[in-house]
Amino acid sequence: MPSNPKDVLTQGAVKPWHVIFIVLVAYVVGGVAADKLLRAFDSGLRPYVRDGLSVSIAAVIMIAYTLVVPEFRRVLPILFRRARVPVTRTDAGWAFAVALCWGYGLYRAGFCLPALQLKPEWFSVVGLNEAMPDFQFRYLLLLAGPVLLAPLAEELVFRGFLLNLWIARWGVWPAIIASSLFFGAMHWERTLFAGVMGVGFALVYLKYDSLWPGIALHAAYNLLTFYWLLGGLFSIKDRATVQDPSNWIPEIALAILFFPFAWLFWRRFRPGRPAG
């Protein structure tokens, strides 16, 4: 059996557009199903529940397709093998740090703040809230989708299948860019945020030649951004003063840190860097 996932994927009839179709179906069905299931749900809680439920449904659909298609099943042992090189604490730390500095720093200070200064009505669109409900233990169920199912399904489909199929066709960098753009597009209003994250996840996968490190990074980021953890600290803003940069000091500080952190991340994860 070939040891390279792209060789296994290209031996059969599966094409990139097949994967794209599966992803589109999964996300559309997930979104529609979540909206219908939450119609009678408390409107104040609905925004906190909807994304988690939608991504859970989409992830289940993508995983189900994977188990049905023979080419996908055959490549699973290769995609989920042990990392080619050990995952060091330093590498993991820089990867996580640059993800946080992008998601809660440069993306918010460089995109969300200017967008709100132009269009204050986008307050909810960029993921902000004026308050959140008190925490209840049942909300821990909301973590199942973003922390368990989504990292597994999305890394499998976007990095495991699409990235490898496009590497076989176009080469490494066109494949990284194309798979990341599609990953971003499937996150709708957070396209820019997710697209850049997709590049990072792709570099992590290529360094280790295994999906496990990327799944762990993806899951850790999603866990920390839970509304009642770090997410709430950055997502709660006063609508009346949200356009004032003085209310975005933490985001601006993280945005500044993003650049040296991204350089250090690149030094360790750039494609073609010697292993180790």
Give residue ranges: language-model regions.
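Membrane-interface helix/loop boundary segments of multi-pass membrane proteins
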Residues: 153-178, 203-210
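Juxtamembrane helix-loop-helix connectors linking adjacent transmembrane helices
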Residues: 39-49, 77-153, 164, 168, ...
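C-terminal membrane module of polytopic membrane proteins
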Residues: 219-276
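Hydrophobic core of alpha-helical transmembrane segments in multi-pass integral membrane proteins
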Residues: 23-32, 56-67, 98-109, 248-270
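Membrane-helix interface segments
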Residues: 16, 89-93, 139, 169-174, ...
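Hydrophobic residues within alpha-helical transmembrane segments
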Residues: 178-185, 216, 220
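Alpha-helical transmembrane segments in multi-pass membrane proteins
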Residues: 19-75, 94
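Short, Lys/Arg-rich, polar N-terminal cytosolic tail immediately upstream
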Residues: 1-12
